[in-house]
Amino acid sequence: MRLLEPIKVGKIELKNRVMFPPMTTGYEGRDGTIVEQSFNFYKRLAEGGVSYIVLGDVAPVNTISPTPKLFHDGQIEAFRKLADAVHEFDCKLGIQIFHPEYDVEALAELFRKGDMEGGRAKMRHDMVHFIQEVTEEQLNSILDKIGECVKRAQSAGVDIIEVHGDRLIGSFCSTLINRRTDSYGGSFENRIRFALRVVDKIREVAPDICIDYKLPVVTENPLRGKGGLMINEAVEFAKILERSGVDMIHVGQANHTGNMNDTIPAMGTQPYCFMSKYTKQIKEAVSIPVSSVGRIVTPENAEALIENGVCDIVGLGRSLLADPDYVKKLEAGEGRRIRHCMMCNKGCTDAIQNRKFLSCVLNAENGYEYERTITPSDEKKKVVVIGGGVAGMEAARVASVKGHEVVLFEKETTLGGQLNIASVPPRKSEMNRALRYLTNEMKELHVDLRLGRTADAEMILAENPDNVIVAAGAHNVIPPIEGSKMPHVFDAWKVLNHEELPSGRVVVIGGGLVGAETAELLAEMGCQVSVVEMMEEIAKEESKTVRPVLFESFEKYQVQLLTGTKVTAITANSVEAENAEGKVSLPCDYVVLAVGARPNLFDVQALEDKGVQVSFVGDCNERAADINRAVEEGYLAANVL
């Protein structure tokens, strides 16, 4: 497998072709120092077999950005500790140097004086105007700071310096952003001038260090990203970078639009390997190694990119969050057991946008590396799991890995629970990867599956269990609205499961995630759809990277959205409601209920009377859960056994 072959980059060798590309994690200390959580995260990736890790957005100045920083000598030791740790696994460490594109000193002074409003106003101004206003003197100072940062990194044992070609540097390069009329603006040669000065500065202070350059491409049809170069100029710039001493080029999507879905597309919003046609053009223009990122999910995706001459090295970001042992499993011939990313963006991209730390909804160990681990139990137990949804299967998986005997009861004839309907709406089919992974793990771990069996206390006690984990799920709520039980009123879950199919004019009551997804599905099927929601937001729970796409779809299909509106009654041919403006009557042929879920009840008194230890996880645990909570609760409940 080419993916697992070594490759020479500059004066170093990578043991395979898999890198962890730069991602903001939120794990670092407030001053940007590598702290224990950050250290453990990267060490765990190295242990999993990746050959090259890039720490994203390492600032050479003291910024307010929640990213790593290396701006004073006191931070060197933490970086050295990390470099030593990943080197133990024959993994190379890189840092991506970036500048936040605002006047760091002026902003810091405003905040130091307590002028928070002035500081925020200054930052908003600079994010738009800094590229036009930064002086030659300031640029020279930035270059000096970069040089000092590189020297610190080299003394810490960092192997590779990646130049972040977006943000400040990409803004200089961009015809869409750079409006300067001096030697840094206008012509192609002028616009790339500062980028080349950065490369020269790195080579000046660290002649032997490996240089990687993240080359952002402004992709077209539609135009996405602003900071960077159009592909024709990107190809020419790549040639110049090689002549300037750069050892490797990392091709990525340009950013600067404010929409992270441009650079980290969620499920169904971009094709797999969507940067490949741009990456290949750059690879064909240079002789140095080229890496690529962008919705590369499976080993087959990655292998094809290398085999077809698209790139030499593959960046797996979200995929390694979902399964840090991705490479190890490939090396062991167990690629079928990789826990593949769904590209939901809930635990990763959304977390960073909300200033939380990086995680993955499918991996309960993310952010808790070496704190949460599955170790064999000292005593083998009999564990019964009630429910074969996400929480139940994760609990069964963890209990089995610990060495327990596990029996899982599921009332349906198939596993998956709500995953089976969650993967039905537009763009959501990639959620099936989670279902396939968990279902396969039940087989690999020899979990005793009792499908089509509604478990009761007598049935469970017959198994003589030591522990019972209840993951009985939830059900869609039928609200106490007049007319809610009429024959033309359908259950959203049943609609998603294709058990009930409305047509014509449809009113969806409830604008949460399920209601919004059901509305989009019905609109796509040709229905005339209205959504009525009591609160002020539609699909509030959806990923921030997906919501814009969802609302574009609503606009395309002319879905009527009514927020702050309460339904008062359902009639044979209308939904009656009221809001701040008065009464509303919506003519309809069908009504779909999506007002929320309620936990399924499961009586465990008889089990507890017999001394059986019982725990509840997932939707049935007091309140309906999302997939992140379902996985985490299933993991934690089983891991203490």
Swiss-Prot record:
Active site: 167
GO terms for biological process, alphabetical: porphyrin-containing compound catabolic process
Binding site for [4Fe-4S] cluster: 341, 344, 348, 360
One Pfam family linked to the record: Oxidored_FMN
Pathway listed: Porphyrin-containing compound metabolism; protoheme degradation
Keyword Magnesium: no
Binding-site list for FAD: 391, 410, 418, 428, 455
The reaction(s) this protein catalyses: urobilinogen + 4 A = (4Z,15Z)-bilirubin IXalpha + 4 AH2; urobilinogen + 2 A = (4Z,15Z)-mesobilirubin IXalpha + 2 AH2
UniProt keyword annotations, A-Z: 4Fe-4S, FAD, Flavoprotein, FMN, Iron, Iron-sulfur, Metal-binding, NAD, Oxidoreductase
Signal peptide: none
Function field: Bilirubin reductase that catalyzes reduction of mesobilirubin and/or bilirubin to urobilinogen, a key step during heme degradation. Urobilinogen then spontaneously degrades into urobilin, which gives urine its distinctive yellow color.
Listed name of the protein: Bilirubin reductase
Organism (species): Mediterraneibacter gnavus (strain CC55_001C)
Lineage summary: Bacteria, Bacillati, Bacillota, Clostridia, Lachnospirales
